[in-house]
Amino acid sequence: MKPLDRIHEAAKALDRHIILPEGEDPRVAEAARRLLAAGLARVTLMGGPEIPGAGRIDPAGGPDLAELADHWHRMRAARGMTAERALTEMRDPIRQAAMRVRLGQADGTVGGAVATTADTVRAALQIIGKAPGAGIVSSFFLMLSCGPGAPVRGGMIFADCGLVIQPDARELAAIALSAADSCRRILAEEPRVALLSFSTAGSAEHPSLGRIREALALIRAAAPGLEVDGEMQFDAALDEAIRARKAPESPLTGRPNVFVFPDLADGNIGYKIAERLAGLTAIGPILQGLAKPANDLSRACSVKDIVNATAITAMQTK
């Protein structure tokens, strides 16, 4: 079974409740229909058409709007939030969906078909917040290589390709640990993590490599049982024969399923090269490190993108 098919089957079994806050967008409404038809999730739309089997909330006038606004007011009062402003801001469907997830009314939310990434991520950070023990909220792309003639088949996690611009050593370690956890949840595989660089096992020296080496030490201290190595060039990480020559002492066994890029520039360029030249399917960015799942879509997303992001959001609740 292909990785995405496994994810869909697992999402069906979980039967999670996901809020889609941009129900007025036709793509979101159609995605809700497909999610319900496939049994991938229970769905509530904010705004938009009435869809059989889906919940629907008017974000501007729901019966519990004042209660939600009161929660938001109390959360932000120390930062100058007034009751009037809290009520206005809680009419925003992205914020309101995040608050409903925070309060346990739904298991997760997927937005960004209309709203900007900045607005979607800000709502998740401010309202849902970080998971206990998470050093940083970051993101990953699920990369699927399943086409005919693909040299590598299966699913892989690429992180961070969408959020943290220039992580320091502690942030890079946190990204890697979150990505390893995402691998377990989404791919149902034990993670094998490669910290990518232009150097393999000390083949080059540059001040920037110290950050990766420090991150590796932090990861090993935090998760001594995790299979992880770096710094490592991509070819050495991917190809066991090359790795045996360049890094014969590497503890990695087999092909890594988690690739951690040193910064956002490398990660963003890398996933797009893999997608556009190698034909991999890229799903994301998926946020990781939040207390409860909330995810962002590209404003250029397709109905299929929304369906897949929702299935992955359901998987993040495990």
Swiss-Prot record:
Pathway: Metabolic intermediate biosynthesis; acetyl-CoA biosynthesis; acetyl-CoA from acetate: step 2/2
GO MF terms held by the record: phosphate acetyltransferase activity
Main location: cytoplasm
UniProt-listed GO biological process terms: acetyl-CoA biosynthetic process
Keyword Ribonucleoprotein: no
Keyword terms, alphabetized: Acyltransferase, Cytoplasm, Transferase
UniProt lineage: Bacteria, Pseudomonadati, Pseudomonadota, Alphaproteobacteria, Rhodobacterales
GO cellular component: a single term: cytoplasm
Homology family: Belongs to the phosphate acetyltransferase and butyryltransferase family.
Enzyme Commission identifier(s): 2.3.1.8
Catalysis: reaction(s): acetyl-CoA + phosphate = acetyl phosphate + CoA
Any one Pfam family match given in the protein's UniProt record, by short name: PTA_PTB
NCBIfam families noted in UniProt: PRK09653.1 (NF007233), pta (TIGR00651)
Subcellular locations according to the entry: Cytoplasm
Protein's recorded name: Phosphate acetyltransferase
